[in-house]
Amino acid sequence: MLKQIKSDIYHLLHPKMAFFLTSVSKNDKPNVMTCAWATPVSEEPPVVIVCVSKESYTAELIKQTKEFVINIPTKKLLGALWICGKISGRDTDKFKRAGLKIIKAKKVKSPVIDGCVGHIECKVWKTVDAGECYAFFGNVISAYADEKYMRNGLWTKEAEIPLHLGGARIVYFR
């Protein structure tokens, strides 16, 4: 028997990859948040979309600077994922709090997170008002992955990519 879903409809589309979304302020102050709402929307040209709460500091920064980076972690960074998903970067240095090290990105000012196995650097092409979120369409400027964990365009089982099930539940891609 099928049950009517009235709230949390997005759970029907989970699991989703959990990742770090990095951004930067106009005066080059880096920021990071945990996110799971992203998807590719075009292969040619390569475009991804991330959806971020309008109330978040991250949304404010992305609207200002028109760029972001998707950083794909392994389960080794699970503790940092939880920290970066529970506090705001407005008044807290989440990188320091979560023990994350910043690396300079290849093509954008938003930082890359050391220890992640993949990175997608984006420039915002379009922003759409999407309910309580902004949907940021990002032109992919640069994308790269650790060849130890990605072969022939696919993640290996050793990558153990965290997948968000909804709420406080995470499983690992194997």
Residue ranges and their predicted role:
Residues 1-174:
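Basic, polyanion-binding surface patches
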